[in-house]
């Protein structure tokens, strides 16, 4: 069962997981390099967004317009307080499971937070940006010079036809590329562990079967049904060790799955409680699991449980 969280006040903009989401999208997320056009869409009450009736119709119109060039269209969802949710990250916490009050009115602070996120996205995106949304969404996009396809009656046949035609026009002289199912997972890894983690963990030739990721016949990670992030195996930890700030260094070889803080010599500063971490002893990855404290606390605390391992290397 997925966790749920309510964002019902202005203070929600500053909740730790919300600020962390916006920062990670700004610092760790790169839009698909081969996309020629991006459509900024409104959020929906149903999560993930793609399961909502409105987004199903948006997606259908985009597909009709793109035809065989669907991989050239990227989608991002505008929302408060998270600001921007790339479509391929909609199953990640907290985007996958939040509720917010829908009033149609946004504060100036909310608008500026969204505008900042869109500016950051636009600076990294090589193609054309379009907006298919009304109310505050359209106001923000217009202030940034983004073409707004429709503001009202977004589910009307006329509006959806306008979206379809605008996509077709944007892709008219573009060459389609094939869809790579590994790319969305690489984006997840980048956001979770840092830029570069996606290609390091999910190599060309990797395969995905029933939510598990394999490379050369060996499992490297699994996709969590609860929060959408990746749970590593020992092999996955080895692939990511040099590309991640989520490493915990021990002064001993662990003989149990419970790692107490006195035995921790160093921990990455980006680590927060609940994060997936790679545990090393010397030059060897000896475990992967969940941090219970942040990086500074893991390194400095003199007592208490710091990490719970999911996979542990057995002593030779």
What is the predicted role of each segment?
Residues 19-22, 51-65, 103-120, 160-163:
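Well-ordered, non-membrane alpha-helical segments in soluble/globular domains
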Residues 69-96:
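Short connector loops at secondary-structure junctions
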Residues 1-59:
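Active-site and ligand/interface coordination hotspots across diverse enzymes
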Residues 45-50, 82-86, 101-109, 135-139:
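Short acidic, S/G/P-rich loop/turn micro-motifs used as interaction or catalytic elements
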Residues 164-244:
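Anionic-ligand-binding alpha/beta catalytic cores of soluble enzymes and soluble regulatory domains
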Residues 95-128, 172-203:
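Extended, charge-rich low-complexity interaction segments
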Residues 111-180:
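Glycine/proline-rich loop-helix segments at beta-alpha junctions forming the active-site rim
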Residues 220-316:
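Beta-strand/loop-dominated core regions that host nucleotide or nucleotide-derived cofactor-binding catalytic loops
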